[in-house]
């Protein structure tokens, strides 16, 4: 049996970062992280993948990983993944299952609650470790990460991974969803809490936030309140990167707390 074990969380070590992720060996020797990730991928492909499935073409599977990294944070489209690799959609489905079984990816399903809206019903996919995602995308330095068109989706994936690790490490169920409707309203993450509460999270890979960034959460909160008990709280967090100068206030919009991602994890 394959043990589903996630990398270290930011609660477990402050060394966890967007660029390096949470694998202990990559964090222990940052200068050698690139070599370690390359070795890890080779070991993972030759040992773990073969242990759970009869993948015959490891080279194509390796290309699949890189392609999946380029779709990090997007709605999962198996046909879109199958075509450039020249494999079938059932093969992609099997490979996705392998990655999920071995805790290499997170599949974030759409929020299920009926809010009177026509919802996008496809899940989103993230690599479980941001360091591995950066490696697969060829991002090896903070400067490259800052300029990368993937910076936003990588940051979003880091938050997804940290939320799931916090839930699992606390002995709870993994419950993380995304929200997107056909009118274009989108909130990065939604998860239920105690006493029927709901937490909405919007992720921004920026150091300065604005009230407009919180608007989608406020719209979803208003829709949720019409369908939920009045006493059920709806918590909203605008999660961002650490500013150069610490902000004096967390309040960015009515009912919304703007927190750095590390502060958000403490407040969860």
Q: What does each of the following model-derived ranges do?
A:
Residues 1-79, 103-104:
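Interdomain motor-coupling "hinge/lid" segment immediately C-terminal to the ATP-binding subdomain
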Residues 83:
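Alpha-helical residues within the helix-turn-helix
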Residues 87-101:
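Short amphipathic alpha-helical interaction segments
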Residues 98, 104, 109-268:
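A cross-kingdom feature that marks ATP-driven nucleic-acid transaction machinery
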């Amino acid at each position: 049996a394959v043990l589903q074990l996630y990398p270290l969380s930011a609660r477990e070590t402050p060394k966890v970062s967007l660029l390096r992720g949470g694998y202990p060996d990559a964090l222990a020797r940052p200068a050698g992280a690139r070599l370690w990730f390359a070795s890890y991928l080779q070991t993972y492909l030759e040992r773990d993948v073969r242990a759970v499935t009869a993948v015959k073409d490891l080279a194509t599977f390796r290309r699949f990983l890189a392609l999946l990294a380029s779709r990090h944070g997007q709605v999962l489209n198996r046909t879109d993944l199958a075509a450039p690799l020249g494999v079938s959609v059932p093969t992609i489905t099997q490979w996705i299952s392998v990655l999920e079984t071995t805790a290499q990816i997170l599949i974030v399903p759409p929020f299920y609650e009926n809010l009177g809206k026509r919802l996008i019903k496809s899940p989103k996919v993230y690599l479980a470790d941001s360091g591995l995602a950066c490696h697969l995308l060829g991002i090896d330095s903070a400067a490259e990460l800052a300029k990368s068109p993937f910076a936003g989706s990588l940051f979003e994936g880091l938050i997804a991974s940290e939320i799931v690790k916090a839930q699992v490490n606390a002995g709870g169920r993994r419950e993380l969803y995304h929200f997107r409707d056909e009118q274009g309203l989108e909130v990065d993450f939604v998860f239920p809490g105690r006493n029927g509460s709901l937490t909405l999270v919007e992720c921004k890979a920026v150091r300065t936030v604005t009230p407009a960034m919180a608007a989608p959460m406020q719209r979803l909160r208003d829709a949720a309140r019409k369908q939920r008990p009045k006493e059920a709280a709806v918590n909203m967090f605008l999660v961002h990167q650490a500013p150069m100068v610490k902000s004096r206030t967390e309040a960015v919009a009515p009912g919304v707390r703007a927190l750095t991602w590390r502060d958000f994890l403490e407040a969860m």
